[in-house]
Structure formats: C-alpha cells, structure tokens
C-alpha cells in the first residue's frame, strides 16, 4: 500500500491529460490515476519481497533493503522502455550539493544512498541492532557516505565556472501550455 500511495501522490497529474478532450478520454481517468500507480507499486512489492529474502539480523538488514529497493527502482526504470519517474534518489537530487554525485553514480546510485540515509533511523528502533558499537559504526558509515556526497558536490560546484559557451543557441519553451494550442501551427512562434 505504501508504494501505491507514493505513486498515486507522484502521478496524480496524469489524470489531467484525460480531461483535455474529456468527451473522448475521461473514461480512462481511473486507469491513469489508480491502475497505473498500482502497477508501479508492484515493483516496490517485489523489492520488499526480495529484501525479506535477503533479511539478516543486525545492520545488514538496512543494506539488504536499500539494495533490493534500488534494484526494484532500476527495473521500474528499465523494463518495457522504463518509467523512472519519481525515483527515490530524486529526493537527494533536489539539493545542488548532493545532486552532483549523480555525475559519478547516476540516479540509481543516488537512490541507493537515499534509501540508506533515510533508512538509518531504523538502526535505533525495535532492537534491530542491539550492540551499541555496531549501531554507531553502521550509522557512522552512512553519515560518512552522505558527507562524502556533500563534499564532492561542494568541490564540483566550486570548480564550476560561469563562463559563456560560444556558438550555443538556447531555446526556452513555456511548459504551461494549453494542450489544444500546443499542436496548432499558428501557435509555434509564440510557443517557441
């Protein structure tokens, strides 16, 4: 259910596309808004089931969960031409310092790091890791990974100049277009 709720909240906007020509397509709205997120949630169900198979006692459980869920996200982004929309790693890509690591490990590496960082509090809950030393060591490893990502981001951004690149033409497109106007040949000039 968590996966369904996650994808439902991240894909609610898909339903708006069925309302452009509502007389023809509104009947498909439940498919886009309910069935599509439910199908995507199956990938997370697979990841959770795989994590359960890899379960072990102690801190390794968090790493098994993070690896299994990252694999599930990668499969979702790859199978049947893929749909990597709203991958968990995008939560780290919202910050310029942490997003720089994507240049090295990509979105799937950021996804693994996000699962580890955001899952770290579980090390202190429910007696998962009873040995205080192991708990602190595993938390230190995760914190060092995050600090390493931030440090790399700071170095990379510090080295980025604001230089102008010659012979580059940049075209900005207004994304908030009425869908009926979008394909009208006479609207091309105002859109572009």
Predicted regions and their residues:
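Membrane-embedded alpha-helical bundles of multi-pass enzymes
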Residues: 1-159
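Soluble catalytic regions of membrane-associated enzymes that act on cell-envelope
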Residues: 153-192
């Amino acid at each position: 259910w968590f996966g369904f709720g996650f994808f439902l909240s991240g894909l609610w906007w898909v339903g708006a596309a069925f309302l452009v020509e509502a007389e023809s397509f509104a009947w498909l709205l439940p498919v886009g808004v309910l069935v599509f997120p439910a199908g995507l949630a199956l990938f997370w169900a697979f990841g959770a089931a795989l994590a359960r198979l890899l379960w072990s006692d102690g801190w390794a459980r968090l790493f098994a969960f993070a690896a299994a869920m990252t694999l599930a996200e990668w499969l979702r982004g790859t199978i049947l031409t893929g749909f990597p929309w709203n991958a968990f790693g995008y939560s780290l890509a919202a910050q310029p310092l942490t997003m720089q690591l994507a240049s090295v490990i990509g979105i799937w590496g950021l996804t693994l790091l996000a699962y580890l960082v955001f899952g770290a509090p579980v090390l202190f809950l429910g007696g998962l890791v009873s040995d205080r030393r192991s708990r602190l060591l595993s938390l230190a490893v995760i914190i060092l990974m995050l600090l390493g990502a931030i440090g790399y981001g700071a170095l990379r951004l510090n080295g980025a100049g604001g230089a102008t690149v010659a012979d580059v033409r940049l075209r900005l497109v207004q994304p908030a277009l009425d869908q009926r106007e979008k394909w009208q040949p006479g609207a091309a000039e105002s859109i572009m």
